Amino acid sequence: MTDLTRVVTEIAEEMRARPDRGEVATYIPELARMDPRAFGMVVIDADGEVAAAGDCDVPFSIQSISKVFTLTLALGMVGDRLWRRVGREPSGSPFNSIVQLEYERGIPRNPFINAGAIAVTDVILSRHQPREALGEILRFLQFLAGDAAIAIDESVAASEQRTGYRNMALANFMKAHGVLDNPVPYLLGVYFHHCAIAMTCRQLAEAGRFLAHSGRHPATGHLVVQPERARRINAVMLTCGHYDGSGEFAYRVGLPGKSGVGGGILAIAPGRASIAVWSPGLDAAGNSHLGRIALEMLTKRLGWSIFGQ
């Protein structure tokens, strides 16, 4: 057993024993069915060594983690023109808040809150029909993860469409301010479905490797994005990736990361590793409770915080 595998295994065992597990998301009915006792973790280092523990091969709804990949696609389509429609600043507000959007005339603070991700999805949809746009997002994730079996959990997507009233309000408000180009029903259909993509920790860690290695996926050698763009995506993940808990995550973990209300977190240790962790119980900000604790333990034990040991 390598040192990396030993550390990951020990952390998973410690997480399994903890009584504090957070609360599963209930506002999306399908997510409320998740087992709060589940925990999985995968770390893939620069040499391709995979350290895996726990429920690392159980698929879960990646939810807002998909926003990392839609941001990457949209930047590839329109470049820095994207930033005319969405900002790069932390919001300090809940991920589905409409208050800030009203003050700022329909321009979302960043691409990782719901309003910002809807605006990013609108850019992708402008190049395609809805089914084609969704297909491009899904194929991109399949390519990055090296696994064509990755698919959308249709029951989760349907659940979101039935109950996504706040997202409908956000989209209609932005549409009224001229921020969105496409019809809101089509746009939200794509948005709900890419948030409902299901992946395992192993697949997600593989998909994120290009961000740990200056935009190049080490498994294939493919340059996914230029090094400068990879750095900037990581920067937005660090400052905005955990909603109004982003500062706490940076303080405790010290890595770029993106969470989802399905309980997943994708974290990037630049030059070192791509990390995926999953535990469905959430904290008050909507981030995985045990996932954040596990990543804090990992960076402390390995000295991987970008701010130093």
From Swiss-Prot:
One of its GO terms (molecular function) is glutaminase activity. Its EC number is 3.5.1.2. Gene3D superfamilies: DD-peptidase/beta-lactamase superfamily (3.40.710.10). Pfam families: Glutaminase. It comes from Methylobacterium sp. (strain 4-46). This is Glutaminase. It catalyses: L-glutamine + H2O = L-glutamate + NH4(+). Homotetramer. It is an enzyme of class 3 (hydrolase). HAMAP family: Glutaminase. The keyword Plastid does not apply. Keywords: Hydrolase. Substrate binds at residues 64, 114, 160, 167, 191, 243, 261. Belongs to the glutaminase family. One of its GO terms (biological process) is glutamine catabolic process. SUPFAM superfamilies: beta-lactamase/transpeptidase-like (SSF56601). The keyword Hydrolase applies.
